[in-house]
């Protein structure tokens, strides 16, 4: 069964503003047991079949009966899809056939009340309304130390949730212990040394990101001001971190990139291929990513602005169970030049 709309418009007629919204919702009954082309439902069908759905402006009453169409008088906001129908009127008294034809479409729930007090189309206007977002506070209360229950208060905006957590749960400067009691927090009661660190941590649970990038068209937002500061350097080109090795003039936007670069000047090659039988290792993760294309794989993603030297890359291969090869420990020092493969 298909839904769509048709707008009766004769040749040379101009639709008025009211007539523009008198489009007809039709129900295609092709393939039903009531005939080759389905039941023929005229515009004048008995309103008792679908109460309240036959209220139409006077302009629509002059249109001729439509084969296979059911006039519902709903404003034309629905997607229209045309389908050929065989001609042929239907008697006004054929209400029983109409009810029988609609009996098999219980899943469509065509007899729902779409009328008063808002008139036709109120149901579809309601369905188009955006779903309101509910933010729930999951801070565990201290009313029952043995089995604490979450606060469970709901809020419609992030600002309301953050204000509630800050005022009602985190407390002011008089708070001695800076502990996160959010439900299922992985810190498990381990305190922070300062309140601002607790506030930054709570954003992991609430999803708050109060630091937007000020550059037009960027649109990125961050939970911490430090991350925003680092990000803005991608727009300004600032590189305040200079390589600490003498004779190297390389500069970087953040300290983690400088740390990754420093392996060029040492014997350390912590980025090791974990494919069984491969002994390649590199001084920089970008070199490892290029190498992994040979195997048709991708290494684990880096951790953003944090240190990219992860235990997964620095440790021996878990697949092969082998130790780092001698080549990974060999000292290759060429100042100012990237010698990674």
Swiss-Prot record:
GO terms for cellular component: nucleus. SUPFAM superfamilies: beta-beta-alpha zinc fingers. Disulfide bonds: none annotated. GO terms for biological process: regulation of transcription by RNA polymerase II. It comes from the Eukaryota. Residues 36-66, 289-309 are annotated as: Disordered. Keywords: DNA-binding, Metal-binding, Nucleus, Repeat, Zinc, Zinc-finger. Its main location: nucleus. Binds to DNA. This is Zinc finger protein ZIC 4. It comes from Mus musculus (Mouse). The gene is Zic4.
């Amino acid at each position: 069964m298909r839904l769509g709309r048709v707008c009766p418009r004769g040749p040379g007629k101009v639709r008025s503003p009211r007539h523009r919204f008198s489009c007809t919702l039709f129900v295609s009954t092709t393939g039903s047991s009531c005939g080759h082309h389905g039941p023929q439902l005229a515009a004048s069908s008995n309103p008792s079949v679908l109460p309240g759905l036959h209220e139409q402006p006077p302009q629509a009453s002059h249109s001729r009966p439509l084969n296979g169409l059911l006039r519902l008088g709903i404003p034309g906001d629905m997607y229209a899809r045309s389908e050929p129908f065989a001609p042929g009127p239907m008697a006004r008294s054929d209400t029983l056939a109409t009810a029988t034809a609609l009996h098999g479409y219980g899943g469509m729930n065509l007899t729902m009340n779409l009328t008063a007090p808002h008139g036709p189309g109120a149901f579809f206007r309601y369905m188009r309304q955006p779903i309101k977002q509910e933010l729930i506070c999951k801070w565990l209360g201290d009313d029952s130390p043995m089995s604490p229950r979450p606060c469970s208060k709901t809020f419609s905006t992030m600002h309301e949730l953050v204000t509630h957590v800050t005022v009602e749960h985190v407390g002011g400067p008089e708070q001695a212990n800076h502990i996160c009691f959010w439900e299922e927090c992985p810190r498990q009661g381990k305190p922070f040394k300062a309140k601002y660190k607790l506030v930054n941590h709570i954003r992991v649970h609430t999803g708050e990101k109060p630091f937007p990038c000020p550059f037009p068209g960027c649109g990125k937002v961050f939970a911490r001001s430090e991350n925003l500061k680092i990000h803005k350097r991608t727009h300004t080109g600032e590189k305040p971190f200079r390589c600490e090795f003498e004779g190297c003039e390389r500069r970087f936007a953040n300290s983690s990139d400088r740390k990754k670069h420093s392996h060029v000047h040492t014997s350390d090659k912590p980025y090791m291929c974990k494919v069984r039988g491969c002994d390649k290792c590199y001084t920089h993760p970008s070199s490892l990513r290029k190498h992994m294309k040979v195997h048709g794989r991708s290494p684990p993603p880096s951790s953003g602005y944090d240190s990219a030297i992860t235990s997964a890359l620095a440790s021996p291969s878990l697949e092969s169970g082998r130790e780092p090869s001698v080549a990974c420990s060999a000292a290759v020092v060429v100042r100012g030049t990237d010698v990674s493969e």
